[in-house]
From Swiss-Prot:
Key words, A-Z: Amino-acid biosynthesis, Cytoplasm, NADP, Oxidoreductase, Proline biosynthesis
Pathway annotation: Amino-acid biosynthesis; L-proline biosynthesis; L-glutamate 5-semialdehyde from L-glutamate: step 2/2
Main location: cytoplasm
Single GO MF annotation: glutamate-5-semialdehyde dehydrogenase activity
Native species: Solidesulfovibrio magneticus (strain ATCC 700980 / DSM 13731 / RS-1) (Desulfovibrio magneticus)
Cited function: Catalyzes the NADPH-dependent reduction of L-glutamate 5-phosphate into L-glutamate 5-semialdehyde and phosphate. The product spontaneously undergoes cyclization to form 1-pyrroline-5-carboxylate.
Annotated GO CC locations: cytoplasm
Entry keyword Oxidoreductase: yes
Family: Belongs to the gamma-glutamyl phosphate reductase family.
Localisation per UniProt entry: Cytoplasm
Gene Ontology biological-process entries: L-proline biosynthetic process
EC nos: 1.2.1.41
Protein name: Gamma-glutamyl phosphate reductase
Amino acid sequence: MSVAADMEVMARKAKEASRAMAAASGAAKDAFLAGLAGLLETRREGVLAANAADLEKARAAGMDAPRLDRLTLTPAVMDGMAKACREIIALPDPVGAIESMRPRPNGLLVGCMRVPLGVICMIYESRPNVTIDAAILCLKAGNAVILKGGSEALASNLALAGLLREALEASGLPADAAQLVPTADRAAVAALCKLDELIDVMIPRGGEGLIRAVVSQATMPVLKHYKGVCHAYIDSGADEARAETIVVNAKAQRPGVCNALECLLVHVDAAPTFLPRIGDALRRVGVTMRACPRSLPLLGEGAVAAMPEDFGHEFHDLILAVKVVDSLDEALTHIHRHGSGHTEVICTENHDRAMDFLRRADASMVGVNCSTRFNDGGELGLGAEIGISTSKLHSYGPMGLVELTSAKFVVLGQGQVRG
């Protein structure tokens, strides 16, 4: 069969399995997660051997060090996947929960019940642990999942998908609720994007090119985990010691993640004192600053002149764009032009300007006097997440179990008819 035909067969199996998953009990889903955690611990050697084969091919192909790091599985990473399974067991099952039940004047009770989305297709790059992390969230939320990982991790992903299917069967759930696309052929993604009658939603997670390709081809809704061009605005009169701590944490703690700071905006009144201070602090942790003409002479060593393309760029590195602005309005205009809808924060002691920023900054998380790094499911109290959506429909921000469900109206009556 052709790749397109193979993908249609896979999607039909997933659709059938999704009906069983929607009706599955919470106990069965938790038994699956417990069983999978055990398999990840007892069968790790086979997975690590498959990963070693992927790494050998990647090195031979000249893969760079950061991508090799993302591709690598270790015993600690395997332990982390098993731990994630057990943590999700502890999360409440959203499926079947009825919210906002209210009486109508005619005696009807009207509410909303959480229901699975159906079949989710997850397309991702490099990190083989996403195979487990994505699948267990989708499955706990009562969905079936089709997984399409990067070609560089195919052997690792096949080994992990085998454990997923084994654990599903052992708990009485359909193995076809978790299927991995077993080919590196790029035609598979194009084919999956056209199966809107069988696949309910696509979730691409990876580089900007991957996400744009899926969005342009998909005939079903796409939840975009888009790039994270995150800004921090330092207001006039801000607590500079606190702002320094926030900026260093947001940029340097984990510079390669999507909620890391990429651009620092500083009010012109704060610039003469704050920029030399933050320049020293960032230099100590190895950050290179790409600065506008007004900020460059104030930052000292470690700063270079910014190019226009540095603003709006996701560096994934110890690099930070810096710009002086004349007002909160100018800061927000810059954010609206260059931001990606991910995370924006303000450091200020002025309540009115803080509230203005919260209302007007367009992002999935907007913060006052805190690091951008808090836009994370665990940090926001949502539990594990499948990604951070920068789309306003159907979910905006971290996508946890609840965000992998939808709601249907339920109406309880006693014989009422419409007149």
